[in-house]
Every structure is written in C-alpha cells, then in structure tokens.
Amino acid sequence: MKKILIPVSIVAILLCASWKEDAKTVSPDRLFLADSGKSLFVTNRAGNELIKMSSDGQKAEQKVTLSSPVNAMTQDPSGNLWVVCDGNTGMMYELDGKKLSVQSKTKSGATPSDILYSPVSKSLWVTQRFNNELWEIDPATRKVKTKIAIGREPVAMAPFAGDSCLLIANNLPEMPSTAYPIAVQLDIVDVPSKKVTGRIMLPNGATDAKSVAVDKNQTYAYVTHLIARYQLPTNQLDRGWMATNTLSIIDLKARKLLTSVLLDTPQKGAANPWSVIVTPDDKQIIVAAAGSQELVRIDRIALHERLAKAKQGEMVTPSVKSWNNIPNDAGFLYGIRDFIPTQGKGPRSVVATGDKIYTANYYTSELVSMDLNGKNLKKQVLGAPLAFTKVGKGDMYFH
C-alpha cells in the first residue's frame, strides 16, 4: 500500500504547488483563434467563462462570464465575436471583439454546438445538437431565417467549395443498433439554396464523431470518431477488437468518403479523439486524444502520398493487405505519425498558428504551447484543477 500511496501523494503535492490555494477551478475546454490567428481564447467550462490570453499564451488579459459553458465561437467581418453557450435553452452572445463586452444576448435552441459566419450568405450558421437542426441567423436582427433538418446530434461543421457548402459532423448514428451498416452520417448543406444536397456515411460502426477540419484549399476534410465493432463478440478488448479511434478522410471534390485510418497502434490506443485541425501550412493534421493525454501529429503530405500509392495496389507498409482493409489496419500510419504527451489530463481542443500549437488540459487546468514540431513545450496553469473536485474526478474516471 505504501508503494502506491507515496507516488500518488507526490503527484498531488506537485499539482498543488502550481496554483494558489484560493484559486478558483478552471477547466479549459475549448480553444479558439480570432483576428487572423493573432488572438487566442480559452473557455473555462467550470466557470462559464471566455478568456482572452496574451499573445504568448502565458497570462489572461480579459475575460467575460456568460450564462453557461461556451461551446463555439466565430468572428464576423466587423471583428465582433459570436459565441454559443451550452444548455437546454442555449444562448448566443455577440461580444465586442476588443473589450469582450456583451453587445447582445439571444436564446438559441437546445444545446447550440457550433457556429460560423458565412461570407457567402452574410449570416450566422448554428448547429443545434438536440434539435437535430442547422439554423441560419441574421446577425443584424438575431432572428432565425432558416431551419434545416439534418442528422442526429450535429456537433461540428466546416465550410468548403469556396465557402458555398457546409460539411456537418453528426455525433451519433440515426439507425437502430440492430441495423447493418450502422454508422454516423455527415450532411452537406448548400449555403445559397439552404438545402441538404448530400450525405456521406462513415464506415460501419462509426460513432461519437467530435470534430471536422478542412485543409486550406478545401480539398479534403478530416473527421474524428470511434469505430465500434458491434457485430463482434465481446470476448476481448485489446488490439481494437471492440472499438478503435479513427480519423476519416473525406474527398470534398468527389463529396464522398476516401477512407478511414486508425489513430491507434497495435500496442497503444489514441483514446477519445476529440478536436482535429490542419495546421496553417497544410503540412500536418493534429488530433487531441483526450483519453491518452497526448496530441497525435500526422504528416499530412506523407499521408496522402501513401494513400495514393495504396490505391494503386502498392504495399506501402508491411501490414497493408488491401485498400479496403485500411480502416482495420493499425499499422497504416507507421512512420508518419507521432504522439506528443501534453503533460496533463484531458486535452480536448487544439489550435495552431504559423509557428505554434496550443492545447489545453481540461482536468489539470493547463494551457500548453509547443512549436510545430511538438518541441519546446510550455505549460501555463490557469487555476485550480477540475480533477481536485469530486465532480471532476468522477468525470475524469468516466472519460
């Protein structure tokens, strides 16, 4: 017993030493960039706050307290920030981009999960998770112009086709659990016509989609999710027998699934893939793996070169059997992917500027920065860790 308690005590002391005794709990849930990547914002889910950090990410410059936790943020051409907040009666806030003062506050559906400003329609688009809808909102009047029925629990979206279309990631499959195939579907919404013009089904078993990112040229989209092996007997858990952590690649020109690659290796899992981004130079894909406390960094150029060769039947790695087997191949990313520990618990969000990657440890209250090679890691403690509360500890054990 002593051998177990001593290391745990040391960890607790080290965590305690990094924040003041009277510090309030801060659980950094999401990160956003504004002002063309010059401004970094972090959310505090425990305190319903939106915090603007200094340019080096080392201190909080401004903050605003809202009605409930922030789920998403976008910026309009005037520089104002539009923020949607969690809850059965969600709220949409308009904030002054410089002062963070509240300009307006509007009720906005059941759990608005993502928001973006469209330069094509000059309006705001909001995914309503538990309404299973996409809303178009006039920023001048803040009134709903259009409601579009989409898939089950939409959680994230990204523009493509010159911003004239939206690719929407739905969290859960719509079909019953006895169906085959059973998988999450993505919706394609045409902005000018305000209609769903296509649907893309992810591989059988795809569930818990969390995030979608698009490259600068809007050629490919990347979606994080799990693949659950519903049709297999539950007689083992290792090597992805029951579930795997996955990145699906969407060909936006063809508007169809290209393939899916496993973030796991045969020896370790990249548990709970949360946020995904493409770095501004289009050279890397970064995934925040919240359950394994690390970032998964993929060489995007090498990935697409490998996929092109595999499509032609080349054996690009020793484990590749065929193109159709790639979604089951835990060795496909060998040599073009690495794992970067975030030195904390629960990294859920990730953003990147021209020279830095930022993530945030949700349970241990740290903003983490590093260079684009995953080196020179720095941590800034934001407050008391959520992991030190009963609710936070239970939540951490569950996730």
Language-model features, listed with the residues they occupy:
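Short, conserved, GDST-rich strand-edge loop motifs in beta-rich repeat architectures
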Residues: 169-183, 223-244, 297-312
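Beta-strand-rich domains and repeat architectures in extracellular enzymes and scaffolds
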Residues: 21-49, 71-72
